[in-house]
A protein has these predicted regions:
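Acidic, glycine-rich active-site loops and adjacent beta-strand->loop/helix elements
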Residues: 68, 96-98
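Structural recognition of the conserved hydrophobic beta-strand(s) that form the central parallel beta-sheet
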Residues: 89-95
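P-loop NTPase motor domains
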Residues: 1-88, 103, 173-180
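P-loop NTPase motor core of the ASCE superfamily
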Residues: 7-8, 15-16, 78-81, 99-178
Length: 181
């Protein structure tokens, strides 16, 4: 190939789609896809800055399915922190958050922290369930009413109302899934 036929830097110039298809069983060429992603983000940021005053004319949405199977993209923790302002968004798809942690080690928290949303389609991996429950869903305030009645020489009745904090969904509730809720 004597010329650039992918033209990764021009993805934000007009409406277009680009697909990378790789084997999910043979990892031989995964590094090429990781390299292409790295190059694409760098070229698009450079083009946004140098040609369009900091923002691409067309939003570039990267839907990166099976992100754990493409290999590590160098500097992804920095890329995810700066692309949004340039009209580039990134959605990473993992089977479990531990895949991101295994691939990016200490930088996985930075990467996940720069994601503005999460879609969880189910799973049972404990650290993923805990992270979703504690860090993504958070807590809710619930009201709990207790009543008591005692009988003896004279009957007494008590009613108590308390406000308590609890996880919006516990790990057990997340694990059950929507079919049982």
């Amino acid at each position: 190939m004597s010329y650039d036929e992918l033209e990764l830097d021009k993805l934000g110039d007009e409406k277009s789609a680009l697909f990378f298809l790789i084997s999910d069983t043979d990892t031989t060429y995964n590094f090429l896809v990781a390299l292409a992603f790295s190059q694409m983000f760098n070229l698009l940021c450079e083009r946004a800055d140098n040609t369009y005053g900091g923002r691409l004319p067309y939003h570039v949405r990267v839907l990166w399915d099976e992100a754990a199977n493409t290999g590590q993209v160098p500097g992804l923790e920095k890329i995810v922190a700066v692309i949004r302002s340039r009209e580039i968004s990134l959605t990473l798809f993992y089977q479990a958050m531990s895949q991101c942690k295994a691939l990016y080690k200490d930088h996985s928290e930075t990467i996940m922290g720069n994601m503005d949303s999460i879609v969880f389609l189910g799973g049972r991996e404990a650290s993923t369930l805990k992270d979703i429950s504690e860090n993504w869903l958070g807590k809710a305030t619930i009201s709990m009413q207790t009543e008591g009645r005692s009988r003896g020489q004279s009957e007494s009745y008590s009613q108590n109302m308390q406000r308590l904090g609890r996880e919006l969904m516990t790990t057990s509730e997340i694990k059950i899934g929507r079919a049982h809720v």
